[in-house]
Amino acid sequence: MAKTINISDAEWEVMHVLWSASAAMSASQVIDALAGRKSWSPRTVKTLLNRLATKGALGFEAIGKTYWYRPRVARDACAKREGRSFLARVFGGDGGAMLVHFVKNTPLTPREVAELKRILDGKEKRP
C-alpha cells in the first residue's frame, strides 16, 4: 500500500465484508451482509462506502444506477499498518511488552502455545 489509509472501526466492518466477497458487491449487497451484525441504516452504509472510496480503499464502477464496490487495498496491508499503529499507541513501540501482555492475558490452546514456542525458538536461532 503506497499511500497510508486510515480506516475507522466502522469502515473496518465494511472492508471485512468486501474482502470476504469473491466479486465486487453493490451497496445493497453490503447493506444485506451487515444487517445481521450491525443495525446501521442503508444511508450509513452508503456513507461509509463513499468515505472508503474517497480514501482510496475502495474502487467502484457504476453500471446503470448500481455502484459496484471492490477493495483497492489488501487486508494484510491494512492489518499490518493498524498493528504498527496499535503497537506505537498502546505499547510505545515495544513489541516484546505487547507479546508478553497478550500471552499472559489471552487463553491459549496447547496447539497455540506450541506454535508460539516454535516461532520463538526460530527467533533465538537467528543472529
Task: Name the predicted role of every residue range.
Residues 24-33:
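Short acidic, hydrophobic short linear motifs in intrinsically disordered regions
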Residues 46-50:
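Short, hydrophobic-biased segments on the C-terminal half of alpha helices
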Residues 80-126:
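Amphipathic alpha-helical dimerization/coiled-coil segments
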